[in-house]
Amino acid sequence: MRPILPALLVLGTPALAYPVTVRSCDREVTFEAAPEAAVSNDVNLTEMMLVLGLTDHMIGYTGISGWNKLDAEMRAGVDELPELSEKYPSKEVLLGAGTDFFFAGWNYGMKVGGEVTPETLGAFDIAVYELTESCTHVMDKPKASMEDLYADLLALGTIFGVPERAEELVAGYRAELDAMLADLAPLETAPRVFVYDSGEDSPFTAGRYAMPTALIEAAGGTNVMDDFEKSWATVGWEAVIEADPEVIVIVNYGDVTAEQKRAFMMENPAFADISAVENDRFVTLEYVEATPGPRNIDAVATLAEAFRAE
């Protein structure tokens, strides 16, 4: 696993001339200067801030410990920053902290029609940049791809006046991914893959607009829910059984462990004929690997190895 704060990224970079404008979903947002009181929501978005070396511009983060997603590496990265809210922050929390920038997404700290949105915060001069993967909740967008991650890192680099730092990081990710994939043995056919996030009565999974679709495809597989016109959402078990996935990716977070999720599927007679269950082909991704963020490259490597396992 690569460190959250690579040494090369904490070095100084030339200052960027302001104002700058970036696209955030269906909006264009202009910044007259780099934010100085930024707040990020969720572990993956916060790691994007950390990997770009932006902690000096932050006053805190939200939405991590409420879902038990803070690992040792992440805890060290945010050691000097307060968690302003264990789950989604209220408008009052952000205002009370003196926030001038909120990095969040739809269902990553904001809800469509909720009290915390770009419009409600904009009235108090709090700028918002929305996670690209989540834009499907407010506009039409292409299916998920690795470009979603790269776009967010480059936009953050522009917003905070470190575009060269972001460009170097993204170029490194591209090169690492290309080199890794070039070394992989070809697959005869793309394995059918189902993402099991949570839920027993009905599974919460990744559709065509969620990052795991991009990770699975980069690793050589195909998401059996690729025709599901959603990002992260609930489906029926009948659809999973009918799709007959050959590999099941378990997203590990929260109170139910990955092993408990695997046991639920292995011990349920209704799933006995699913190929992945029959052959015990499960692979675990941590939440921070399965959602858009710096650990996506490691996630592709994990999936690629699992897809080629005997």
Question: Where are these predicted regions, by residue range?
Answer:
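Bacterial Sec-exported substrate-binding components of ABC uptake systems
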Residues: P3-L5, G12-M48, T158-Y196, E305-E310
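Short helix-initiation/N-cap motifs at beta->coil->alpha
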Residues: S24-D26, L81-E92, V112, S134, ...
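A short, structured surface patch at a secondary-structure boundary
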Residues: S40-A97, F101, W106-M110, V224
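Solvent-exposed loop/turn segments at secondary-structure junctions
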Residues: N44-E47, I64-W67, F101-F102, N107-K111, ...
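Alpha-helical, coiled-coil/dimerization segments enriched in small aliphatic residues
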Residues: W67, T205-W232
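Short helices/loops that flank or line small-molecule/ion binding pockets
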Residues: K91-F101, E119, V235-D244
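Extracytoplasmic ligand-binding site segments that recognize negatively charged/polar headgroups
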Residues: Y108-P118, I126-A155, T189-M211, E259
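Structured C-terminal subdomain patch of bacterial secreted/periplasmic proteins
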Residues: K143-L154, T158, V247-E310
